[in-house]
Amino acid sequence: MRGSHRAAPALRPRGRLWPVLAVLAAAAAAGCAQAAMDECTDEGGRPQRCMPEFVNAAFNVTVVATNTCGTPPEEYCVQTGVTGVTKSCHLCDAGQPHLQHGAAFLTDYNNQADTTWWQSQTMLAGVQYPSSINLTLHLGKAFDITYVRLKFHTSRPESFAIYKRTREDGPWIPYQYYSGSCENTYSKANRGFIRTGGDEQQALCTDEFSDISPLTGGNVAFSTLEGRPSAYNFDNSPVLQEWVTATDIRVTLNRLNTFGDEVFNDPKVLKSYYYAISDFAVGGRCKCNGHASECMKNEFDKLVCNCKHNTYGVDCEKCLPFFNDRPWRRATAESASECLPCDCNGRSQECYFDPELYRSTGHGGHCTNCQDNTDGAHCERCRENFFRLGNNEACSSCHCSPVGSLSTQCDSYGRCSCKPGVMGDKCDRCQPGFHSLTEAGCRPCSCDPSGSIDECNIETGRCVCKDNVEGFNCERCKPGFFNLESSNPRGCTPCFCFGHSSVCTNAVGYSVYSISSTFQIDEDGWRAEQRDGSEASLEWSSERQDIAVISDSYFPRYFIAPAKFLGKQVLSYGQNLSFSFRVDRRDTRLSAEDLVLEGAGLRVSVPLIAQGNSYPSETTVKYVFRLHEATDYPWRPALTPFEFQKLLNNLTSIKIRGTYSERSAGYLDDVTLASARPGPGVPATWVESCTCPVGYGGQFCEMCLSGYRRETPNLGPYSPCVLCACNGHSETCDPETGVCNCRDNTAGPHCEKCSDGYYGDSTAGTSSDCQPCPCPGGSSCAVVPKTKEVVCTNCPTGTTGKRCELCDDGYFGDPLGRNGPVRLCRLCQCSDNIDPNAVGNCNRLTGECLKCIYNTAGFYCDRCKDGFFGNPLAPNPADKCKACNCNLYGTMKQQSSCNPVTGQCECLPHVTGQDCGACDPGFYNLQSGQGCERCDCHALGSTNGQCDIRTGQCECQPGITGQHCERCEVNHFGFGPEGCKPCDCHPEGSLSLQCKDDGRCECREGFVGNRCDQCEENYFYNRSWPGCQECPACYRLVKDKVADHRVKLQELESLIANLGTGDEMVTDQAFEDRLKEAEREVMDLLREAQDVKDVDQNLMDRLQRVNNTLSSQISRLQNIRNTIEETGNLAEQARAHVENTERLIEIASRELEKAKVAAANVSVTQPESTGDPNNMTLLAEEARKLAERHKQEADDIVRVAKTANDTSTEAYNLLLRTLAGENQTAFEIEELNRKYEQAKNISQDLEKQAARVHEEAKRAGDKAVEIYASVAQLSPLDSETLENEANNIKMEAENLEQLIDQKLKDYEDLREDMRGKELEVKNLLEKGKTEQQTADQLLARADAAKALAEEAAKKGRDTLQEANDILNNLKDFDRRVNDNKTAAEEALRKIPAINQTITEANEKTREAQQALGSAAADATEAKNKAHEAERIASAVQKNATSTKAEAERTFAEVTDLDNEVNNMLKQLQEAEKELKRKQDDADQDMMMAGMASQAAQEAEINARKAKNSVTSLLSIINDLLEQLGQLDTVDLNKLNEIEGTLNKAKDEMKVSDLDRKVSDLENEAKKQEAAIMDYNRDIEEIMKDIRNLEDIRKTLPSGCFNTPSIEKP
């Protein structure tokens, strides 16, 4: 089929309905022609019915056919009529485009000239009744169908049917039957009809289109409304509206029409019967129920209506959510039936259609989710238990208390009706003094006024207690407090008990006592001081009976209380200090220190007007101050209750300010301090009586009982009491110092050791713990803990062993003569070339040195090792043996050894230098390994006879080339001591740029001159044609004429010569003729000079243009110079970035290795007894802190390494851009060089042309002058006119000469300027090349910096290793001290040697710092540009400082420390693996590093960290050595204190609950991992959806089609 988007208009009318259909079709066509997007409203904007345009809904829509010919290919024949006529047969092949007849041809464009059709298989393949073929058309959306038309390519079927579906998932409904046997085939009456009132949705059957003729081109048109009685009232017929609605159309072909000849089963006949349809058209409109004028594709590529009239849905079949005021209806011609909005009074955006409401009110919109607490179908009233003050305001909740109000509904003002005893607008609270709101009202409060504040809680009745009071009614003191009284702002007084007990009560037997001064007799011990503490005068008045101070300056003076007010005044705590005071002037200036109390190292003060006191005045006023720390009495600084009582318990000073202005006086009287004392009188209830714990005694727990001592003696009664620690050798001790009275040969403050000359374990607690030492002379001894063997501990220097029978490490000899005669132990002699801290430096028997350092060897380390040279006995290690460093290429047999004294290597022939690393002058090729070869430079051609040390290329004279400078360069000549000269042959005029030996060039035809740069006579230079061209033939006459003029000129010159001599006489006529001839020649010369002038002017114009061009080129060169400078800067930055990045990786690796080694080396065992004087607990603690610090550094390194990895990519990208910029610069330089050569050639051409013009003009001028001279020498035989003309000629010649001179001068100036520009350009080019070379060297410098950083890292690691070795030795030393006291004393004697080793280690550290400093210097360049990095570094430093402080505050138990270190080591190993992976990534991306200004700063910080780490480690070792050096003065009390602190630290470690925190972190990590997995799953689902959408998009058509109206022909 070649179908059309528009259905065929020519349907044959039949029946009574066709005129109506014609009118409807015409109206539809007119409506579609004027269809527009806004036709759903009329010109006044009122809604009206609108419909999409009438279209062929089947156009280009895919039809699904259940049978199609061509698979496999088959033959069919065209039916031509009666039997016997020859049939025309063809082939149907689905694989051949021109032979296929697929279902797509049913709905394609209908072209009558080229008909296409769908075709089924033939009857030969079994296509005939009862088998059927279905053609199914899926419209993709509901349409209002007007007709269905089929055009058959063969004869029409005998029987076929049309079906439709109203919904895509609905059943197939018969639409129409066509059959010549309706009753037999479809059980339908033939040509039936529908009566009025009948079922208008039934399908009819007709035989009208079932004839076999025509054999082709037969049409079948089905009109959906034809024969339906309600078609004239379609808008009011829901049955017909449903009838015309279809989403799918199916045509079922049931039986073929035949001539009956198929009964003979002739294959050719059977091949002529088949179904073939050329056009399948469905006329209708997209179904939108009158509420849309168009349909369009949605986001899912589905066809939907573009709904108006507040409707929505695929077919506009529903009202929008808020437009439910009336039921949805289909639009009609009379009414648009648009959906109307609900009336919710602006308080809701949601509603639904309420049929009951619609029937009762005419408005069916029932609002939901009313806002502002409104209710009703239209949100017109407040909800229950809500109110509003105005109709336009929101409703507010009454909030009436359900307990305290009589009703939950309030009045229009929001006030509730309260029950008796309840108050408030909401009846939600009790009246003052009542509590517990219930159904019966509120109950009265029952608070104790001494311990409560204000009223009770209105909900629970619980009273609000003072700070130190508890109980429902605040009727008792909290534990640790006593003496409940109303005057106390805290209610109760805290127990003091010197901090040892929190249980106390009121003491019995104490009465009120006042300490006072009334000044009736004298000043009563009071004195005065100035502000700085110096004494001041005090006056006592017998008349006023007071004391006074007078100030003559602005600085105040104070009254100082006497001793009776001081001392132990803790019984005045919570009581008052009062005095009477006045001043003589009202001008007062108060301060925060008007009343000052001092004691127990504490100091508090208050202003005079504090605690409600008045300003000082001229009238005597009594001032009262309560001695209490409560905030109501603002003593500053604020103290705790215990601190305030501690101050009063040792009160050392009371100061009362006396003067408050300059030159004023203050008067003090009646000072009273309330206190208490034992005895009868008014009871003093504020005195405590403590209940003391075990070991304490006294009313205030201020004493230690017998058998107990002060834990910290210098704290006095504030120190805790602990049991006497005498190890069973004493039952009592001094209660203040704790020193035991030892017996049983024990000694020490706690009897913790044996007396001198005794050995044993005095801590066992028996009388036989200490036994006499078996050593000679009763010297000291010790017991080996494991073997219990007694060994002597005070052997002579250099000896060791259980009985001093062996030489100590570092000594040799045979003290017992076991290997010969007895030889005392002597110090090893190794020429100071051993490490004094090392073990086994020499053989203890022979003294042979075994561990020589500084590259030395020999029995006494007295010579250099092979491959080294120098002085092995030099005092400075740096001056000892150094590596030979012989050059492998220049040394005989590639030896690495040299003279052990001078270091001179054995060189190959013609090789020189101590390391054989250079060739002799005039030789080269050291890399050959066979010695250097002679340069053989030519004596004349080379400059100095030297050559390149690698290539052998000699340095040649200008213009000379060759390996040995033996020949001229191309286009040069004249080989000699000054070099070769350039031929300078003109490229156009010479046959070759190479000249002859005399420098002359071979010229082309028409050129002359040594350089072939001039045209031959009668030749001219044509710019548009290369070379000198011969002048046209006419110029030969000129040449001849010139030859004649030359002959005549010679004759004239001869004549003038003859006139001068007078040898020949000339007649007047002859002279006149010759004069006229001369005049003509002069005129010709003048014309030639004028022509030369014009040529010169043209030349000047050309020179001006050249100058302009040169200026622009110079400007561009300047830009290129700037680019080169920027490129150099960028290259320098890139070099620094690469260098810093590489160094950063090395530093990170080194820091991790250091942390790992340090962490692995801190596993120390705890000594068995902390009371041992040789205990090395401090050493173990320092090791633990060292491990913690290295762990922190390792964590920092991991983070820094990751940052370095990230920033390395940026650094490399910058380097690539820099190199790309350098390549671009090199290209621009090359281009500029080429343009410069072009400009230079043009300038040279102009110079040559100017020179030729100059020569021609000069010759012309000379000739003119000569002619004038000749004329001037003639006798005045002619007229005056001739003379004037001659003068004019002379003047013109002079002017011409001046003009030529001026032009020549301008040209020379221009040429000089050109030379300057040329030099400047050459310099710029050279500078560009230099900058490029500098950029090329940056990578080499980066490599060198990397090597330097690696060397620095190596030195740092070596230094750290040496320091660790020292630490290990010290740990070993710790073990030996515990085993043998004698060995410990010997180690103390070695401390100077150890200090020397530390000095050498410091020296090596400084060397490492210097090596690291070179890397840090480069990084410092970015310091000012990295404020953020500094902030980060500062934060890290603060964090490290905090960590160190925390480590110093806690001394963890050594065994727990070992476990912690093991865990930390595992973490370090994991961090190392992670860092290794990061480093591998960094190595792969090393050359892709980027702008690393931040990375450079971080590299500097890390370099500094490395340096500080080494320095800190050495400092720790020095501290440890100092502590080792002080072992002989061990403080046993200090050791006990450390042991106690260690136990506290252990408790703190347990309290910190690290295991739980780690577990929590692991759980959080698992949660995060699960969340990440969920995110990954979501991402996978989203990606699947995206891929599905992409597949859908690919199946969509690439465009839309806008075809003509369906009703147009």
UniProtKB/Swiss-Prot annotation:
The alpha-helical domains I and II are thought to interact with other laminin chains to form a coiled coil structure. Domains VI and IV are globular. Residues 1038-1609 form a coiled coil. It is found in: Secreted, Extracellular space, Extracellular matrix, Basement membrane. Glycans are attached at residues 60, 134, 576, 650, 1022, 1107, 1161, 1175, 1205, 1223, 1241, 1380, 1395, 1439. Disulfide bonds join 286-295, 288-305, 307-316, 319-339, 342-351, 344-367, 370-379, 382-395, 398-410, 400-416, 418-427, 430-442, 445-456, 447-463, 465-474, 477-492, 724-733, 726-740, 742-751, 754-770, 773-781, 775-792, 795-804, 807-825, 828-842, 830-849, 852-861, 864-881, 884-898, 886-905, 907-916, 919-932, 935-947, 937-954, 956-965, 968-980, 983-995, 985-1001, 1003-1012, 1015-1028. It comes from Homo sapiens (Human). Keywords: Basement membrane, Cell adhesion, Coiled coil, Disulfide bond, Extracellular matrix, Glycoprotein, Laminin EGF-like domain, Phosphoprotein, Repeat, Secreted, Signal. Residues 1-33 form the signal peptide. Binding to cells via a high affinity receptor, laminin is thought to mediate the attachment, migration and organization of cells into tissues during embryonic development by interacting with other extracellular matrix components. The modification Phosphoserine is found at residues 1149, 1493. Residues 514-689 form the Laminin IV type A domain. Residues 1030-1609 are annotated as: Domain II and I. GO terms for biological process: cell adhesion; cell migration; endoderm development; extracellular matrix disassembly; hemidesmosome assembly; maintenance of blood-brain barrier; positive regulation of cell adhesion; positive regulation of epithelial cell proliferation. Found in the basement membranes (major component). Residues 46-285 form the Laminin N-terminal domain. This is Laminin subunit gamma-1. One of its GO terms (cellular component) is protein complex involved in cell-matrix adhesion. Residues 286-341, 342-397, 398-444, 445-494, 495-504, 690-723, 724-772, 773-827, 828-883, 884-934, 935-982, 983-1030 form the Laminin EGF-like domain. Gene3D superfamilies: Galactose-binding domain-like (2.60.120.260), Laminin (2.10.25.10).
